[in-house]
Amino acid sequence: MESTRMTRTLAAMQLMDSALPTGAFSHSHGFETYLHRGVIHDASSFGVWLQMFIQQQLTFTDAVVIREVFRSTSLKRVGELDQLITAQAVPEQIRTAGKTMGIRMLEIAEQGYPDPALIWYRREVDQRTLSGHPAIVWALVARALDVAEDEAVAQHLYATSMSLIHNAVRAVPFGQNAGQHLIRQAQEWVTAAVGNSADIEFDDIGSITPGLEIAQMQHENQRARMFMS
């Protein structure tokens, strides 16, 4: 694929847009459990959860995998990373969310940015040899377009944070201005996560705070739910 600064920017704006039809609007990644308990009750308390989510789950999973895709020298390694990021997601709803959003994003990305590695990944996912995951899809596109590794990590983490903030605005709820304030705060948390992820040993992938995963597992048995995870 031809890559210029403009094509890289526009590709990120498209694929990292919270409006991309991947189904991200239907996932809370566990914050709905904290909302049900009353731990999250306003924009400030949601911000505490979001900062933890970025520092823990996104930093030790998605960010590490994106970096590893950039450094991979074979498609076999990409396949291993797909299996690993899927297997390390202990809560079933989180595994399912990764698969469904990954498949939808892969379909869009493969049509718009048909890089050989992305075409291979689409074929493997279609054949159910691999599961599909948004972090790997974006890493393959970003690498093909010569997006800098740190920028690719930041864009994915920021996009995920944006989707969660939009979901929280309607679920908690709180106002749009409070949401914009959180988006600004999230930029600082994402910047820190990008730096921290560069120093994480690959063997530490998936080292997530147990409380976060427990809340994600408990969500499945919640009596009333707005979100699928």
Curated annotation (Swiss-Prot):
Principal subcellular localization: cytoplasm
Name of the protein this chain belongs to: Urease accessory protein UreF
Gene3D superfamilies: Urease accessory protein UreF (1.10.4190.10)
Pfam families xref list: UreF
Organism of origin: Corynebacterium efficiens (strain DSM 44549 / YS-314 / AJ 12310 / JCM 11189 / NBRC 100395)
One GO CC term on file: cytoplasm
InterPro entries, sorted: UreF, UreF_sf
Tagged with keyword Heme: no
Subunit structure: UreD, UreF and UreG form a complex that acts as a GTP-hydrolysis-dependent molecular chaperone, activating the urease apoprotein by helping to assemble the nickel containing metallocenter of UreC. The UreE protein probably delivers the nickel.
Function, in words: Required for maturation of urease via the functional incorporation of the urease nickel metallocenter.
Coiled-coil residues: none
Lineage of producing organism: Bacteria, Bacillati, Actinomycetota, Actinomycetes, Mycobacteriales
Keywords, comma-separated and alphabetical: Chaperone, Cytoplasm, Nickel insertion
Single GO MF descriptor: nickel cation binding
